[in-house]
Amino acid sequence: MTYIENIFLCIVSPLLVAALCMGRRQLRFFLFCIVGMGVCLLSAYINTFLAAVCRADALAATAEIAPVVEEIMKLLPLVFYLLVFEPEGNKIKAAAITVALAFATFENVCYLIQNGADRFSFIFFRGFGTGAMHVLCGLIVGGGLAYTWRRTWLKVAGTCGLLCAAITFHATYNLLIAYGGTAQYIAYALPVLLVAAGRLSAFRLSQRK
């Protein structure tokens, strides 16, 4: 049995100390890191509970339950941040990416502890693939929220649409992973390639301007 709450405490403890020592400008980054790992921990409990209640098999839990729960849990702190602090667009995007990054990091650490780290090539591809998938979902949601929350009429519909887009991409990724074989490595490569393509497009647009 993997006691993920103990892992959470071990990882978060130095982050809390660092957050107290750093200035106010860096505090936001550490807080969103802690929040991202916290929602990952809560997502694991909720996924397990819903899988037991629905009597879902491994495939259903991975492709149907986990993407919905995890993307909703990652969205909730961002909505709270938007409602309470009303941040600027660039801060929303940075917060979404930080939460997604911390979520992916904690998920990868728990996976390594539970399954071992002896297969370097597999762990390498999984680390990049899972990290890029969560970051890409964060980019979708964060970039979209920065746009939709500037327009009152788009807030609710836009947020729901962005959440559905992130869930769909996450579910597709998990489904390919669960299928195994070549599809698994396609899943690992897909988010990395999409992030790279997005950054290249952004760079070309900035060069034209």
Q: Which ranges hold each PLM region?
A:
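Hydrophobic alpha-helical segments at protein termini of multi-pass membrane proteins
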Residues: 1-209
